C-alpha cells in the first residue's frame, strides 16, 4: 500500500471495476429491496442536495445488498419541461432565432440534440459519487417505454372520469406562455398602492350618506374593464339597502350588480370590493357562488384585448353581456393600461385617493415575471377521489414518513387538495393524447388510429392533436412503476414493486411524493385487486445549507459543487464558476469578495469517501443540514487514520492463524472483539432506523478511538516482546486482521472506495473469499463474544493510563521520562487487575515502578489522579525544574488575570450590556467563566509545585 492515502488514485478505477463486473445489478437471493433515484433534471448538474441524497441512498443499498437482499437501485433523469425548453430557447435566441422560426419538429430535434450532449454530465457525476446504481436500467422520462406508460395512464384516468378538460382560472406565465402550478409561483413582498375609485350608482340610487356612488378599493385598477359585480358584506349596515341594485362601470358604461358576500371585509378600505372573476382567484370563487359572467380582458401576453371574451362558469360563451373595451386601451400591456386607466379616473373626478399598500406579488419561479390569473382551456386531474386512498395508506401505516412529523404536512396538503392542472403550453414534454375534429369535439386515445377506430372516424374527418404537453410532475408521478415496464406485467415490476424507500427533500412532498402515491394507487393493483403503494417508507431530509445556515443558491454565490470537494478546485476557477451566468450581474463583486475570503487557497481535494461520510454524519432526521468544510477535513483525516492503521496491520499481520494454527487471545483482544459486537449491533440498529448520523458516529468512535487509538497501542507490547508466547502473538495478529476486516465491511456503505482498496489486501489474511467487499456478508453481532469482564478490565487500565498522561501534561513532564507510580486506596479487584497487567502498564505508560501503598502509609508529595476510588500518585521531586515551571505558570496566570479583568470590565459596563445583542453577551460570559476556571486550575497547580 502507498504510504499516504490518495483518493484519486483508487476511486475511478474501482468504480470502473464494479460497473464492468456488473456488481450493481440485482443478484441477492433474499427479498427484493428497491430504491428509485429521484430523477434530477437533465438540464443541470448535481448540487449538494443531490450529493447528500445519493450518499444516503447508496448507504442503504450497499447495506441491504451485503445483507443478501435482491437490491435494485435504478437511476434516471427527468426531461424537466419548462427548464429545458427555456435553456434551449436561450441558445437559439443567441443565434438570432426563436422556436417559432424553427417550428415544433425542428425545435424538438434541437432539444434532443442538447439532451444527448449534456445528459452524460449527470451520470458522470453520479459515478464520481460512488453510487452503485444499475446503469443497465437507466431511464429518462421521455424514453419510448415511459412515453407509452404516460399515454396509458392519461387514457385510463380519462376513462375513469378522473381527467377532464375545462375552462378555468390558472396561473398564467406571460413570458413562457404556459399555465404553471401554485407550487411554481413565488410570492414576493413588495411596496404597492391601493387605489380608491368612485363607481357611480345606477338608477338614481344613493348610499346611506346620500352619495350617488360607491368607493371601491383595488390594487389592480386595470382589471376593472372585466368587472362583473361590486360586493359588500351582507352584515354591513352601510350598504344593506343597496344589495341587488347596480353601479355603472366607469369608462365602459356596463351595468353590474351590487352583491352580498362574506368574502368582503367591512374593515378593509370602504368595505366595497370590485369583483373580476376572470382575473383574480378569490373573485373567481365569489363568481361561482353568484353565477357571475367571466370577462377575460387580456391576451396571452397580458395585453388588453379588442373586446372582452365573455364566458359562463361552465366555459360556454355568454352572448348576453356587452364586452366592449374602449379603443384607447386595446393592445396596451397590463401595467401601461393601469397608468392610463388611473389617469382617466382622475380626469373624470373618480379617483378618490392612492394609498401605500404592502403587496404579495406572485411571480413565476423560472421566468421571474408577474403571474396573471387567466381564463384558459386546460386539462385537469380530479384529485379528491385519488387523495382519499392516498391519505388512508399513510394513516394505516402502509406508507411511513421518516421523520413522522412530515405526515402532518402531507395530511394538511392532501385534505385541502385542489384539482391539478396538468396541461402546459410548451413543446418539450409528453404531448397530450387527445385529438380534435373541426367542430372542436375532443377524442382521447393512445394514438390517432385508436381514436379513429373507437369512434368510427373515416379518413374524411380531419383530426388535430392537442398542442399542449403534460406537466412534468405527471410523468415523474409514474416513476416507480413506469420504469419497471408498466403497463406490461413484467418480471421486474412483479419483483421490485412496491419499492422500499424514497429519499427526498421536504420541499417536494406535494409536488412529487403525494402525486406518486395518488397515481400509483389508482393505476397499479396487487393480485387481489387492492391498490399498490409506490414505496413503503419516505425518508425526508432537510435542505443542505452553507456553514452560516444560508440556503445555497447561485444568487447568494455560496453554491458548492460536490465534485469540487472531491477533486479540489483552485481559487480563480472557483470564483469564475460562482460569478458566471448570474441572473443579477450586479452581485458579481460581492460574490467574488465573499469567495476569496472563505476559500483563500481554493478547495483541497478531499475524495469521495470523506464527502460521503460527512453527508451521512450530518443526516439528522428532518432538520436542515448545515454543511461544514471543517467536517470534510476531519473525515479526510479519518480516512488517513484507517489507511495508516491498515498499513500497520498488513505489516504485522502475517502468521495470524489463517491456516488454522493455534492462537490465544489476550485481554485486549477479547476487549476489542467485545466492543466490535456492540458496534455491529449499533450500526445495524441505526441504519434500520435511518439514523445515518448515529451509525456514522458509532463507526467513527469504534475505528478511531477504540481500534486505532487504544487497541493498536495495546497490541504493540505483545508483538514487540520477544518473550510473548507464539500463540499469544498469533492471537493478537488474528484479532488485528479480523477486527479491521469486519470494521471495513461496516464502513463500506459509507466509504466504499477506501474500504474496497484495503479489503482486497486484507481479505486473504482474514480468511475471506470473494472478489469484492460489496458482496461480502454484512457483519452480525455475536452476543456470546461480548466480554463484560474484559471491557471492565480495559476501562480500568485506560483510566490508569489516562490519569498518568494527564499528570505528565499538567506538570509538563516529557512523555519519554520514566515515572515512579504509587497507588493508594487499592481494592482487591484493583490489585487483581494490577497483578495481571503490570508488565503491560509499565510499557504503555512508561513507568519504572508501581508501588501499592498500604492503609496508613505516608505518600510522598505527588500529583494525583483518580480511577474510581483508587488514587494514582506521581511523586514530583526531581521530575521537574521547579523554578522554570513556576515562572511558566506565573506568566500564564498573569495572562489569564488580564483576560478576566478585560472581559469582566466589559460585562460590568452598562452601555455594552444594554446595546450588545444577547448572543454576544452570552459569548462574553462564557469566555469569562472559561478564563476563571482555567485560572483556578493554574492556581492549584502553582500551589502544588511551590510545596515540592
Swiss-Prot record:
Positions of short motif 'HIGH' region: 40-50
Coiled-coil intervals: 879-947
Major localization listed first in the record, in broad terms: cytoplasm
Keywords on record: Aminoacyl-tRNA synthetase, ATP-binding, Coiled coil, Cytoplasm, Ligase, Nucleotide-binding, Protein biosynthesis
UniProt-recorded Gene Ontology molecular function terms: aminoacyl-tRNA deacylase activity; ATP binding; valine-tRNA ligase activity
Motif ('KMSKS' region): 551-555
Subunit structure as annotated in this protein's UniProt entry: Monomer.
Notes concerning its domains: ValRS has two distinct active sites: one for aminoacylation and one for editing. The misactivated threonine is translocated from the active site to the editing site.
Protein name: Valine--tRNA ligase
Organism field: Pseudomonas fluorescens (strain ATCC BAA-477 / NRRL B-23932 / Pf-5)
Taxonomic path: Bacteria, Pseudomonadati, Pseudomonadota, Gammaproteobacteria, Pseudomonadales
Gene that this sequence comes from: valS
